[in-house]
């Protein structure tokens, strides 16, 4: 199953338009959720290992909101429990990836409808999961994490177009707005959540 998921990830990242036009819509809900869980676990295991190796883990070096939250709360959990912040970083990353999934699906479903989209909740699930592939698969890579977050933004455009039928211009404008908010958030909070490796 892991090799199949890695093959899917490669197709999403290398052939995003072809994938979103065809294969993405044909995937069942269980398959999409399993893919998301496997890649989330992959991210949750590798993120703290890279931190232990001495690379920074702060909000600027996070590809996902789950990593940002984990970096913020892991030191606090370490103080409360005595368990290493690196263990907490992994656990919290995975937990927050799972918690955020239905929230992001609901958020993007509502906004897709407001933009004139015609997809159902399954399309919104695929809209969250498949464009998130670069951040989930590669978001642990030192000093390039933010780049993978931007890659996710790039993949949202064809996903909005092909999974919800949203016009290209609206899809680009919406994604640009969301990425602008994310960049502003990073700029405003970037120095405050540093975890020393």
Residue ranges, per PLM feature:
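C-terminal TM-helix exit segments that contain a strictly Trp-centered aromatic cap at the helix terminus
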Residues: 46-55, 143, 184-193
């Amino acid at each position: 199953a892991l090799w199949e998921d890695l093959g899917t990830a490669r197709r999403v990242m290398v052939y995003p338009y072809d994938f979103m036009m065809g294969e993405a819509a044909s995937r069942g809900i269980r398959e999409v959720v399993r893919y998301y869980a496997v890649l989330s676990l992959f991210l949750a295991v590798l993120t703290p290992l890279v931190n232990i190796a001495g690379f920074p883990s702060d909000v600027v070096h996070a590809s996902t909101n789950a990593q940002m939250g984990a970096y913020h709360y892991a030191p606090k959990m370490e103080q409360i429990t005595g368990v290493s912040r690196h263990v907490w970083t992994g656990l919290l990353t995975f937990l927050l990836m799972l918690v955020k999934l239905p929230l992001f699906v609901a958020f993007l479903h509502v906004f897709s409808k407001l933009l004139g989209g015609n997809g159902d909740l399954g399309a919104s699930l695929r809209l969250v999961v498949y464009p998130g592939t670069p951040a989930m698969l590669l978001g642990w890579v030192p000093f390039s994490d933010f780049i993978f977050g931007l890659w996710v933004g790039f993949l949202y455009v064809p996903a909005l177009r092909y999974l919800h039928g949203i016009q290209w211009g609206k899809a680009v404008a919406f994604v640009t707005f969301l990425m602008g908010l994310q960049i502003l958030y990073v700029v405003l909070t970037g120095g405050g959540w540093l975890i020393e490796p």
